[in-house]
Amino acid sequence: MDSPVTGERARPLIAIPARFSSSAAALRFEAEVAARKLVEAVYAAGGEPLSVHPAAPGGTVSDAEVARRLAFADGVLLPGGGDLNPVYYGGAQHESLYDMDLEQDAFDLAVARWSLRAGRPLLAICRGMQVVNVAMGGTLVQDMPRHHRHVRSELALRPGTAVHGVLGHDTVTISCYHHQALDRIGTGLHRTASSEDGVVEAIELTEPGDGWFLAVQWHPEDTAADDPAQQRLFGALVSAAASKRG
């Protein structure tokens, strides 16, 4: 779609479910936020990042409602955030869990289901990958024996996987911040990268459909401005969104 004002090709619209926050600088009350590095990476890739209010009153929202609200989006980015309530995957609540919000969880899960079902290009990061896994029937390790917080490490990638194709290297440096990890992999998904200690770092669809999808456990936005390999993840999402738009 071209801009009616300039005639230039309009940026693909990338929907990003906002994160609920108890406070934010310059705001007096509770807020909805998106990580600045995340939206800047999307914008640098040529996309137009748009925050979406994660409305799910009482922790309930229908997939049909999410489909209606996100119909405008050319692509979707599920970002990091707090812990997913284990009620969604049949687990008892561990004492280490934090920042849980049933409204946020319900909305994100519905977004994941809709994106995959509708074939809408989807990049899922950290919590976002965990949400996709749970949405597809998978489970999580609620508190890893060894947390990956403020950690940068080397990750080996397997040729032939989508994540290898996008990043373009056999080994990349990743920035991690998480204390949870994937346990049982959801239906229709498979792991395509793992850390040296066995943590699932990337998942893809077992049988890719019409829409582009990739999920990673690390935070590519942390280093995207200085690492072209990490920025290519956002470029791949925006490119797929542009192709979907036609």
Residue ranges and their predicted role:
Residues M1-L123, V134-M136, V141, P145-L167, ...:
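N-terminal beta1-alpha1 cap of cysteine-dependent amidohydrolase-like domains
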Residues M129:
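The feature captures the ABC ATPase H-loop/switch
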Residues Y177-A181:
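Short, solvent-exposed loop/turn elements at beta->coil junctions and helix N-caps
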